[in-house]
Amino acid sequence: MLDKSGIIKRLMLSNQKASAEIKALKGPEKPGLFAFQKHIHQYVLDKFLLDDEEGIQTDNINELAKKSVEKAGKLNPNEAALLDVSKHCGATSSYMTKKVLLYLALAEDLGVNLQKYDMSEIETTGELAALLYRETQASEHAFVYLDNAATAPVEDVVIDQINQRIVKCNANVHRGIYRLSEESTATYEKDRADVAVYLNATPNEIVFTSGATESLNQAARILSDFVSEGDEILTTVYEHHSNFLPWQQLALRKGATLIVATSAEDLESKLSDKTRIVAITHCSNVLGTYFDVKHICKKARETGAISVVDGAQAIAHSHPDLKEIDCDFYAFSGHKIGATTGIGVLYIKDCLIKKLNPSSFGGGMVKRCSIDDCTFEDAPYCFEAGTPNFVGATGLATALRHRSMREEDLFLKEQGLMKHLVKGLSEIKGLHLLSDAALHNQKQVCASFTVEGAHPYDIAMLLDKKGFAVRSGMHCAMPLMTHLGIEHAVRVSPSYRNTTEEIDRFLQALQEVLLICCRSDGTP
């Protein structure tokens, strides 16, 4: 037994205070997980000794567990969870049993109902501590996600539809003649048709891919036959690496020249009869500002160039009409719009898709294959080699269908949040915004900034400690970072899921973080 001499009375007096202190950790000044565990360890020690003094006087681990379970069973609804965790946390010593039992006593004091979890999946007390940490932060000052430009939370309706797809119709498409496969194929093609309707396109123009990166790489591979030595590929300094590297590498392979414009006007001035491809982002993932892709695609078409638009950011905050934009290619991912990762779209204009050859080969995209030759399926199927992500396609189509019912209101809310955010950031001393378009009644979907004397990584790390998720780094846009004369930046990207109150708390937390990172005069 632990030596309780001289400390029992103190523990009995301090135990309620210790519990109250831990409950107070739900507030905005919540600690990191490590600090949280330190608090729990002290609480566990106090609570165990107090319980021991009240009558559990045994070194026998089974007797200890039995008596504690009996006691806990009279006090809370976690009895089953208690038994499960004792079993699965490797409670092979008195110390481990004490930890398991008293973590659960703490859960009860904090009002955490563990019955909603499958406790058989908890294999260590560290995992149990992490679960309690997450639960205590699910309060009025919950974790605030502001990195939607990277990946958006999956919509509940998407999760429900994906679950139904897996449970009720999880069969390969375009292969079997049995009923389940035919149902799966019909669902897959309906999802394709719904995506096409949303984009004002036709189903045969919609190619499902693994995401925007694969879409753009596939476009570059497909278009390699259109590029020869001495030709030019035109892009901008604002591109995400996914719409820069494929064209850079294509130019290197073909002996062509990659021309990089520094503005929309500069891009237009660089168009020539040598331009074969114009690759441009619809919306910058760093600045959050839009390009007039309709005008740029028109100018590209007038010179005989093929236009490729990266819509990864734009699709999340606007409703692109591809007939109106009149581009040749358009690419985006599902995970930016509330669907899952691993699914995306490559739109290819009908008059062009029929002339193109596939760049990936395998099952599902071939009509006939002999030792010497083969013939391919018609578009878009010839561009979908292998088993497609038909479950992901359901998620993507569901996300677009769900959003289309209320998107005008959602987009308006986002712009209101962005204007509020950018205004608040603009008022912070020493903070340099890379774009303040929202303050000039222009659409802006994210805000990136640097701060004199503070490294973006430090800012993001400290904001995380305060419960805010933001992105820091080069944002997969090194050419733009070089053009702007910086190495890294902090990016804040809210969505319609956020609130004005969360933006206000973020701005307050940021100012507190900057007091740590910088002196009062903004210097290191």
Where are the predicted features?
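Flexible, low-complexity inter-domain linkers and amphipathic docking helices that mediate domain-domain
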Residues: 1-139
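Pyridoxal 5′-phosphate
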Residues: 133, 137-524
